[in-house]
Design a protein with these regions (language model features):
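N-terminal alpha-helical modules
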Residues: 2, 9, 27, 33-37
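Bacterial N-terminal signal peptides that target proteins for export
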Residues: 2-19
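General helical secondary-structure elements
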Residues: 6, 10, 41-43, 47, ...
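Bacterial N-terminal signal peptides
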Residues: 17-28
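Class I SAM-dependent transferase core
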Residues: 33-120, 131-132, 136, 149-151, ...
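Conserved nucleotide-cofactor-binding alpha/beta core module
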Residues: 112-232
Length: 251
């Protein structure tokens, strides 16, 4: 009898739930966390936040919240999805990787993006970092030099509801001048110098984050702030990133 009595209300609640999903989708809201079935990776994602981020030096509450919200496993394919919350980078195809969760969180924390700021990412990759950044501002642009990765990332971001992120295939060396200047630029590939167009497209007082150094061994994560006198440079920590390719290699 109890089961029969509950059946009607449960069906009604389910109908309301999916109606809300449809409405959220029509508003271009990042609704993947709301509309999907119970997330089998929720516990793994929380462990990642607790053990890899909080246990280190990720202290920004907003960064921790976003890292615990964005479903990293949806940005990976095949067998790598089950390893999404492990403490290391993972392959995404074409010799590229998705950075380990700690590095994504750290770079996001260092860049310190505020609501309404314009952010340019160089190296879309899987689209995960752009998705994370979009929770801080609704003005995110991203450039990926590898055409297939760019197409997959764009499709993935739209499917997951991140339609406000503007992504394109192109050489990140040249930035995205049509939308410049930017408050912040994040480069997610290693280079031995900063591409001049990127500095040109940075607002006065804006900051640029990039792994600088050898493109075959390791680099130093470096923060550059544009000032009236030129730039302020902060060398932060040693990292290992895949190399930036394209025009940058000709200089």
């Amino acid at each position: 009898m109890i089961t029969n009595q509950m059946a009607g209300p449960r069906k009604q609640l389910k109908a309301v739930f999916w109606l809300l999903c449809i409405v959220a989708g029509s508003l271009s809201f990042p609704y993947e966390a709301f509309c999907e079935a119970p997330d089998p990776y929720a516990a793994a994602r929380q462990r990642m936040v607790d053990r890899q981020l909080k246990a280190r030096d990720i202290t920004d509450s907003k960064v921790l919240e976003v890292m615990g919200t964005v479903k990293r496993h949806l940005f990976l394919s095949g067998r790598y999805g089950s390893q999404a919350y492990a403490d290391h980078p993972l392959p995404i195809g074409e010799g590229q990787t998705i950075s380990q969760p700690y590095i994504v969180a750290l770079m996001t924390q260092i860049l310190d993006v505020k609501p309404g700021e314009k952010v340019l990412e160089i190296g879309t990759g899987s689209g995960y970092q752009a998705a994370v950044l979009s929770h801080f501002t609704d003005q995110v642009w991203s450039v990926e030099i590898r055409k297939e990765l760019a197409q997959k990332a764009s499709e993935r971001l739209k499917t997951l509801g991140y339609e406000r992120i503007k992504a394109k295939h192109g050489d990140g060396y040249f930035g995205w001048p049509e939308y410049a200047p930017f408050d912040a630029i994040m480069v997610t590939a290693a280079a031995n110098h900063v591409a001049p167009p990127l500095l040109d497209q940075l607002k006065m007082g804006g900051r640029l984050l990039i792994p600088l150094g050898s493109t075959t061994y390791y680099q130093t994560l470096t923060k550059i702030t544009k000032t009236p006198k030129g730039k302020e440079v902060e060398h932060l920590l040693g990292v290992v990133f895949v190399p930036m390719v394209g025009k940058i290699l000709e200089e």
